Structures are given as structure tokens and as C-alpha cells.
Amino acid sequence: CSTEILSLSPASLREMALESLPPWPDDMVLSGTNEHGQKILHEGEFVIALYEAMPATIDVAIPYTYDEYVLVLEGSVVLTSTEGVRQEYQTGDQFLVPQGWTGTWEMPGRFRELIIVETDQWEASDSLLAALFASPPKAGSSAPAVLPLLANTLQQAELDSLPPWPEGVVITGTNAHGQKVLHEGQLVSVLYGAEAALLEVGAPFPYDEYVFVVEGEVFLTSKGGSPKTFGVWDSFLVPEVW
């Protein structure tokens, strides 16, 4: 797989052509148009894909088999859990649907999203139809809830201090940073913050890292390459071994 930074510009992602998917089974579509498509953008430790659906309400009666991170690129969606918890997300919002979730997805207009799913789970399902083949929930298990990841809330969240970077990592600036773990499952979702600094990434990245910028900006320069700039609302992927 590529070792280059993958820019995920919302404007480009909204215009990208997708490949048609087989229709959902009829009993899953409560109302609307049974038409959708996807495009895989990256496949490494996790899969990044674009997904689009026409206006419809989808019944997810069988539990999700995987954690799914979602960034809404176009349209809006109303998620209502089997327990009756209703959440609405608009363009630019993010959320995480946890493994085991059930409920309905209501998409009042054309809906496009960027999604991230752990690769082994994606390959086991081979498509977004994975939820159809899940095992039923265990009796007495608590219902998992969708985790909102709204930028205005994340900007205000308190972080836990991290130990300073080792000597030699910080070229200039302040060696102070912190994080807060928001979700730990098949995917780990973490809020990270740092003071102004220039860091040297001398050892290759040990993992794929998807980044959504909620405050400030960052300049990434590959060895021998030109800098790439990302600001608030931008997202990108730092691939393993970068």
C-alpha cells in the first residue's frame, strides 16, 4: 500500500464517482429508494471508503458486526436506536457506530459519508451488507450507543497530559501534549492536542492513522517531498511506515 499522506478533501470526496452496490434486501428498506454505492480509498490496517445512498430509511435489525466511524460529507442522517435514542447528524458532523448497534438510518435526502472500518472485519463481510450476517445479541447485554464526535464539543474537552516527547523529536517549539481516549473497540478514537512545535518523525509510523483537524493547522513534509497543509475541518491519512 502507499506510504504517502492521503489527503481527504471534503470537496473532492463529494464529487468522486462511486461504484454501484447490490440493493439492500427489500425488508431492510422501510421507505425510499433502494440505491447506493461506494468507493474504497484506502485498505491497510483499516479500510477508508466513500458511501452514498439515495433518500431512504434503512432498518438495521441485526446488530452491526463492526465499529464504523462516519464523517458526513453531504446530506443528513437520523439514527434511532432500537431503545428509542434519536440522534441527528448534518454535513461536517462525525460519529462512531459501535459493534452491536441496532436501529434505523433515516436519510431524508441524498446522503454521502466517509467511513472507516477495521480491515479484518471489512474483509469478513466483503461489503456494507455485513450487518446481515451478524449473530444475534447475547441476552442481557447492554445496548451499545452511537458516539457523537462533534467538533465544537471536542474543541472544549479536557485532555490528560502525556509524557514529553523524547529528546531529538522536538526540533523547535514547546514539548507539551495530551490526549483523551473517546472509544476503544475494533477502532480506537482519540482526541489529541499539542502546543506549537515542529516534530521530527524519524522512526516509521507503526500504524495507519486517520486524522480530522478540529483546531489549528498542521504541515506534513515527507522526506524529499513538498509540505502538505491541513486546517480545521480537513482530514487525512498517515499510512503505516510513513
Residue spans for each PLM region:
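A short, N-terminal "cap"/entry segment at the start of jelly-roll beta-barrel domains
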Residues: 2-50, 126-190
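Residue-level recognition of conserved beta-strand positions in structured domain cores
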Residues: 50, 64, 74, 81-82, ...
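A short beta-strand-loop-beta hairpin characteristic of the jelly-roll/cupin
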Residues: 62-91, 202-232
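Threonine-centered tandem repeat motifs in low-complexity domains
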Residues: 12, 31-33, 80, 88, ...
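Short S/T/G/P-rich N-terminal loop/turn motif that feeds into the first structured element of a domain
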Residues: 56-57, 121, 134, 138-139, ...
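Ligand-binding loop in jelly-roll beta-barrel domains
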Residues: 86, 91, 99-124, 231-232, ...
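Conserved short histidine dyad/triad with adjacent acidic residue
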Residues: 34-35, 44-64, 99, 175-177, ...
